């Protein structure tokens, strides 16, 4: 107790220590030094950024694209320019001779091998999407991690490499999706990126801006960020895009400000914390979206699940999603590589905060929460495991026991089922492109009834001004209500598209995957038949449908919150359904815990 009291007193004077045990001033210096490294970049990286920051697509009037009622969610590519086909998988696929055939790195990677994605895997994936999906989707949600892991001590990552690769991947996404096509008369497909924990240096550590790092990211992503939001982005690396003007937006928020593995984050209660500022920004955006009768998808890299986020950050965000269930459709995230859903209980989060005196305490939130992600270490800047899956079956068993089983028990009370549905919001965690398992991504379909894409977007002047005031470090902090807590949803507002069938309600999805074992065999067979390497790759590489939301053994009528809550309950009762769910969670790779 004395030690904790001393820590609180030190924090009051700005001299606290982070959870790594290092002095807080040392952590801030480390962050500043990392930012300085990002400023000193190779001329090639600068050239990439200059290319990326050329003509702003938003400055030229263009015809609206016909809506298709579909969008793409893709995440965690982790391209590795050091990857060498045929080298040792045990050596991170970085050029060491393979010990035997089982240790030989395939051209497109090997599921569960632990290596990052070959550049060919990224390039062929995007080429496949361009051929088969690009003209059939309305927007792209792209949730981060665009650099390799720091999994090779002989070749540690540098800030320059991370910056260069982020710029390169951003260019590819822009040219594939958002750049004007059809003679510069037709709008491209909007792309909404978000920041991953491996997109920063050192990984996981990221402070509130403006910093050299946030400015560099703004330059790289300028073509994706609406011009009026770019100044605020330099503070919180968060923004939103009207993917359907005046009807639907995607909010990209920086989950690293809530992330337990960020040593600069302690909670979301103290005004000096980055998560506190981000919640103020998010609240203002949601308030304006409600005023305009718009709906939103939340998106970010790290999924908001307990112990993935700091306790107060998780509870506050879950409460916001509950009180804004008329606005928020759901959340789209990456990071964990496991294809699954997590129902966030907003009412439970609200009760937890109220029990703690409306979150005004400065003590660390030590509430026991289920589902520690098990994978991240605050202190280890070196990520020795890389893409290797670890204890994922154990994670799924805990998801079953700690989350899905209590839902099933709650649904036993037939009289309270409707209330049980509305208390939840859905956290959708996506499969990744990196071959932690097999590469995968998802195409969502949604209701287009009554939606017109030809509406001109209205200006966001009031909201932008408000956001700048919130994030300004010079703004005088006034005492008053805690605005990181949401207001109660007005009773006259019905629940939104995530809960009640209406325009923009998600109705089905298709999960695509690349079976790497099959692809690598076909590639070898094509080479043996005398084809060139590129001809063999073109013939062998493909994505195919792994499953859809309508497939047995647990077909879903639609993708409302109630459908997911019912599915969580069904999975606890039907052994066949659960086994299929776990197999799909690991992207049909056959993964088992060692």
Swiss-Prot record:
Residues 1-24 are cytoplasmic. Its cofactor is a divalent metal cation. GO terms for molecular function: endopolyphosphatase activity; exopolyphosphatase activity. Glycans are attached at residues 123, 447. It holds the Pfam family Metallophos. Its main location: membrane. Residues 475-492 have a biased composition (Basic residues). It is a single-pass type II membrane protein. GO terms for cellular component: cytosol; fungal-type vacuole; fungal-type vacuole membrane; nucleus. Processing by proteases in the vacuole may be required for activation. Residues 1-20, 475-497 are annotated as: Disordered. InterPro entries: ASMase/PPN1_MPP, Calcineurin-like_PHP_ApaH, EndopolyPtase_N1, Metallo-depent_PP-like. It catalyses: [phosphate](n+1) + n H2O = (n+1) phosphate + n H(+). GO terms for biological process: polyphosphate catabolic process. Its EC number is 3.6.1.10. SUPFAM superfamilies: Metallo-dependent phosphatases. It is found in: Vacuole membrane. Residues 44-594 are vacuolar. It comes from the Eukaryota. Keywords: Glycoprotein, Hydrolase, Membrane, Signal-anchor, Transmembrane, Transmembrane helix, Vacuole. Catalyzes the hydrolysis of inorganic polyphosphate (polyP) chains of many hundreds of phosphate residues into shorter lengths. Belongs to the endopolyphosphatase PPN1 family. This is Endopolyphosphatase. The lineage of its organism: Eukaryota, Fungi, Dikarya, Ascomycota, Saccharomycotina. The gene is PPN1.
């Amino acid at each position: 107790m004395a030690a904790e009291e001393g820590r609180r007193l030190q924090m009051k004077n700005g001299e606290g220590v982070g959870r790594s045990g290092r002095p807080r001033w040392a952590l801030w210096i480390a962050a500043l030094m990392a930012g300085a490294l990002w400023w000193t970049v190779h001329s090639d990286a600068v050239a990439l950024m200059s290319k990326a920051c050329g003509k702003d697509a938003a400055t030229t009037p263009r015809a609206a694209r016909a809506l298709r009622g579909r969008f793409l969610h893709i995440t965690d590519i982790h391209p590795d320019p050091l990857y060498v086909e045929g080298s040792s998988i045990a050596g991170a696929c970085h050029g060491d001779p393979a010990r035997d055939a089982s240790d030989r790195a395939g051209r497109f990677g090997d599921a569960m091998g632990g290596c990052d994605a070959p550049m060919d895997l990224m390039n062929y994936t995007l080429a496949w999407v361009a051929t088969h999906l690009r003209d059939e989707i309305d927007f792209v949600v792209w949730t981060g991690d665009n650099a390799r892991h720091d999994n090779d001590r002989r070749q540690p990552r540098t800030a320059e490499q991370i910056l260069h690769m982020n710029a390169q991947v951003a260019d590819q996404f822009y040219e594939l999706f958002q750049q004007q096509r059809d003679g510069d008369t037709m709008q491209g497909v909007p792309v909404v990126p978000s920041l991953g924990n491996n997109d920063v240096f050192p990984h996981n550590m990221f402070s509130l801006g403006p910093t050299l790092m946030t400015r560099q990211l703004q330059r790289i992503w300028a073509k994706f960020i609406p011009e009026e939001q770019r100044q605020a982005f330099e503070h919180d690396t968060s923004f939103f895009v009207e993917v359907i003007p005046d009807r639907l937006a995607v909010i990209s928020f920086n989950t690293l400000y809530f992330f337990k593995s960020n040593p600069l984050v302690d909670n979301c209660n103290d005004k000096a914390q980055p998560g506190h500022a981000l919640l103020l920004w998010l609240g203002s955006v949601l308030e304006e979206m409600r005023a305009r009768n718009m709906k939103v998808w939340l998106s970010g890299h790290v999924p908001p699940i307990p112990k993935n986020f700091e306790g107060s950050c998780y509870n506050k965000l879950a409460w916001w999603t509950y009180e804004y269930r008329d606005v928020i459709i759901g959340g789209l995230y990456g990071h964990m590589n496991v294809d699954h859903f997590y129902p966030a209980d907003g009412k439970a989060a609200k009760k937890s905060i109220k029990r703690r005196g409306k979150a005004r305490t400065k003590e660390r939130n030590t509430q026991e929460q289920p589902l520690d992600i098990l994978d991240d270490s605050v202190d280890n800047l070196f990520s020795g495991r890389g893409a290797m899956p670890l204890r994922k079956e154990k994670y799924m068993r805990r998801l079953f026991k700690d989350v899905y089983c209590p839902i099933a028990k709650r649904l036993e009370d037939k009289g309270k089922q409707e209330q049980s549905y509305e208390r939840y919001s859905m956290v959708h965690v996506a499969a990744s492109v990196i071959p932690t398992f097999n590469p995968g991504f998802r195409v969502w379909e949604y209701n287009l009834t009554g939606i017109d894409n030809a509406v001109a977007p209205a200006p966001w002047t009031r909201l932008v001004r408000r956001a700048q005031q919130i994030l300004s470090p010079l703004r005088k902090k006034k005492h008053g209500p805690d605005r990181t807590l949401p207001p109660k949803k007005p009773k006259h507002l019905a629940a939104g598209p995530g809960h009640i069938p209406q325009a923009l309600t998600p109705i089905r999805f298709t999960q695509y995957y690349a079976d790497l074992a099959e692809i690598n065999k076909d590639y070898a067979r094509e080479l043996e038949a005398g084809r060139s390497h590129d001809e063999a790759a073109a013939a062998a590489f493909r994505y195919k449908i792994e499953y859809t939301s309508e497939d047995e053994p647990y077909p879903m009528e639609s993708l409302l919150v109630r459908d997911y809550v019912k599915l969580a309950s069904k999975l606890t009762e039907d052994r066949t359904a659960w086994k299929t769910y776990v197999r799909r969670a690991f992207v049909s790779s056959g993964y088992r815990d060692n």
